[in-house]
Amino acid sequence: MTWEYALIGLVVGIIIGAVAMRFGNRKLRQQQALQYELEKNKAELDEYREELVSHFARSAELLDTMAHDYRQLYQHMAKSSSSLLPELSAEANPFRNRLAESEASNDQAPVQMPRDYSEGASGLLRTGAKRD
């Protein structure tokens, strides 16, 4: 009788194990699929970020090159306009505002501090203004 109980327990255990594996395995597969998708999305995000950084770095290089080339073109036009058109007055010359060498080599425009006052008196303190 003991062998019969052992055999019945073994069969019941195998059935319970098979059922548990069937339902438990589905959740495990879902978890593994989600984990794989998460890792794939993280890798894509990292790749996108690297691509974005390289794009902006290349754009900055191109803008610097373009600014340098523009300065060279402007200096060339200013030199050639003054040498080819010497009789043209300074006011009529479109390239009269020649860039200084120090300005041409400077990558940034000079920054002036903002003023915290206006040119003349305004508002109630203004003198000499007509009142209607």
From Swiss-Prot:
Pfam families: ZapG-like (PF06295). Residues 95-132 are annotated as: Disordered. Keywords: Cell cycle, Cell division, Cell inner membrane, Cell membrane, Cell shape, Membrane, Transmembrane, Transmembrane helix. It is found in: Cell inner membrane. Disulfide bonds: none annotated. Disruption phenotype: Deletion of the gene results in morphological aberration, such as branched shape, and cell division defects, such as filamentous growth, defects in DNA segregation and generation of chromosome-less cells. It also shows abnormal FtsZ ring formation and aberrant septum development. Deletion causes high sensitivities to various envelope stresses, loss of envelope stability, increased membrane permeability and causes growth defect under normal growth conditions. Loss of the gene results in aberrant cell size driven by the production of excess membrane phospholipids. The chain crosses the membrane at residues 1-21. It is a single-pass membrane protein. Residues 22-132 are cytoplasmic. One of its GO terms (biological process) is cell division. The keyword Repeat does not apply. One of its GO terms (cellular component) is plasma membrane. InterPro entries: ZapG-like. Forms homooligomers. Interacts with proteins of the divisome, such as FtsI and FtsQ, and of the elongasome, such as RodZ and RodA. Also interacts several other proteins, including the shape-determining proteins MreC and MreD, the N-acetylglucosaminyl transferase MurG and the lipopolysaccharide assembly protein LapA. It also copurifies with LapB and various proteins involved in LPS biosynthesis/transport and phospholipid biosynthesis. Involved in cell division, cell envelope biogenesis and cell shape maintenance. Is a key regulator of cell envelope growth, playing a crucial role in coordinating cell width, elongation and division to maintain cell envelope integrity. Plays an important role in the lipopolysaccharide (LPS) assembly/transport. It may regulate LpxC levels and assist MsbA-mediated LPS transport. Belongs to the ZapG family. This is Z-ring associated protein G. It comes from Escherichia coli (strain K12).
